Regions:
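N-proximal low-complexity "stem/linker" segments adjacent to membrane-targeting elements
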Residues: 1-30
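Short aromatic/hydrophobic "clamp" motif used to bind/position activated sugar donors
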Residues: 90
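Donor nucleotide-sugar recognition loop
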Residues: 98, 155, 170-194, 198-202, ...
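Non-catalytic, C-terminal membrane-associated alpha-helical segments of glycosyltransferases
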Residues: 225-228, 240-297
Length: 297
C-alpha cells in the first residue's frame, strides 16, 4: 500500500549484524533529504536474535519500522519489507552498507526522468585494505562493466543498491523466495524485470559503501554460494525462456581474468588476480553441488 506521505521506502534485511546495522541506520540520519519524505523498514531475518539495541536509538530520528520473521533468507526478508512499505518507490540496501548523503536526492532526480524504470547504483568497497573484500567487489565491478556497459539498457544490479516503483515490484511478484541464500536472487529479479518488457538504468552517482569483511574462507564460501545461486538461476530462466543463454562466451571469462590488471598495480593486483581464479573454482564447485543435489537418486 502506497501513500502520498513517503516518496521512498528504504528496505534493509538484516541477520545478526547489529553493529553494522547501526552504522547503516546512522547513514540514513545523515541523508541530505527531507526526513518526512522517506521511511525505513528494517526486517530482522530471525525471531531468535534481537536487534532492538541497534535499532532503538534511531526510532526518534527516522520514520523507522522494525519487522521480524523466522529465518528465511534475504529474498523473503526484502519481500516482507516491500509489501509493508508505504512509499511510491522502494529502495533496497543491505545492513553492511552505508549510503552517500545525496543517495535519495540522486534517485529522485533519476525517477523524475524515468519513473517506470529499475535504477541501480554504484557500490564502493569500503575496506580497500582487505584484499578479499576488494576482490569480491572487483568481481561485481567486472559484471557491471559487462552487463551495464550501456547505462540506459542495463541488465544486472546487486540488491544492495537498487530502487524501483513499488507498484511494479508488486506487479511482478517481488523476489523469488526459492532463492534462500544471498546468491542469485537479485540476478533472477533483474532478468524477470527485463523479461516483462521493463527497462533498467545504471546510475553510478547513486552510491553506497560496502563494509563486507572477508577472510579467505569467507571469500570461498561467498563464491561457492554464488555458484549455487547461479545453478538455480539457470534452472529458473530455462523455464522462462527455452533459448535462455546458459554459458557465457569464452571472451567473458578471459576478460574477467585479466580485469584485475586494469584496476591495481603491485602485489595486491597479483593477489586479486589469483582470487579471481579461485572464485571461478568456487563457483564451479557450488554449481556442481547444486546439480548433484537436484539430481534424482
Amino acid at each position: 500500500m502506497t501513500t502520498d506521505k513517503f516518496l521512498f521506502s528504504i528496505i534493509v534485511p538484516t541477520y545478526d549484524r547489529p553493529q553494522k546495522l547501526a552504522l547503516c541506520l546512522a547513514s540514513f540520519v545523515k541523508l541530505e533529504y527531507p526526513g518526512d519524505r522517506f521511511q525505513v523498514i528494517v526486517v530482522n531475518d530471525s525471531t531468535e536474535i534481537s536487534i532492538e539495541t541497534a535499532v532503538s536509538p534511531f526510532q526518534k530520528q527516522l520514520n523507522l519500522e522494525l519487522l521480524s520473521q523466522p529465518n528465511s533468507g534475504p529474498a523473503t526478508a526484502r519481500n516482507t519489507g516491500a509489501f509493508a512499505a508505504k512509499g511510491k518507490f522502494l529502495v533496497f540496501t543491505d545492513d553492511d552498507c552505508t549510503v552517500a548523503p545525496d543517495w535519495l536526492q540522486t534517485l529522485e532526480t533519476r525517477f523524475a526522468e524515468t519513473p517506470d524504470c529499475l535504477v541501480g547504483g554504484r557500490t564502493i568497497n569500503a575496506l580497500p585494505d582487505n584484499v578479499y573484500s576488494t576482490a569480491s567487489q572487483q568481481l561485481i565491478d567486472y559484471l557491471y562493466s559487462y552487463y551495464n556497459a550501456i547505462g540506459d539498457r542495463a541488465q544486472f544490479f546487486t540488491s544492495n543498491n537498487f530502487a524501483l516503483p513499488a507498484a511494479a515490484f508488486q506487479n511482478i511478484g517481488g523476489f523469488d523466495t526459492s532463492f534462500s541464500l544471498a546468491a542469485g536472487e537479485d540476478r533472477e529479479f533483474c532478468d524477470r524485470w527485463l523479461h516483462s518488457g521493463r527497462r533498467a538504468i545504471y546510475a553510478p552517482e547513486v552510491t553506497v559503501y560496502h563494509f563486507h569483511e572477508l577472510t579467505l574462507r569467507k571469500f570461498w564460501r561467498q563464491q561457492f554460494n554464488y555458484g549455487r545461486g547461479a545453478f538455480l538461476f539457470q534452472q529458473t530462466i530455462s523455464k522462462r525462456a527455452e533459448n535462455a543463454k546458459k554459458i557465457q562466451h569464452p571472451s567473458f571469462y578471459l576478460n574477467l581474468l585479466i580485469y584485475p590488471f586494469s584496476q591495481k598495480s603491485g602485489i595486491q593486483m597479483l593477489l586479486i588476480a589469483a582470487l579471481f581464479v579461485l572464485s571461478q573454482t568456487a563457483i564451479a564447485a557450488g554449481i556442481l553441488r547444486e546439480k548433484k543435489n537436484s539430481s534424482p537418486n
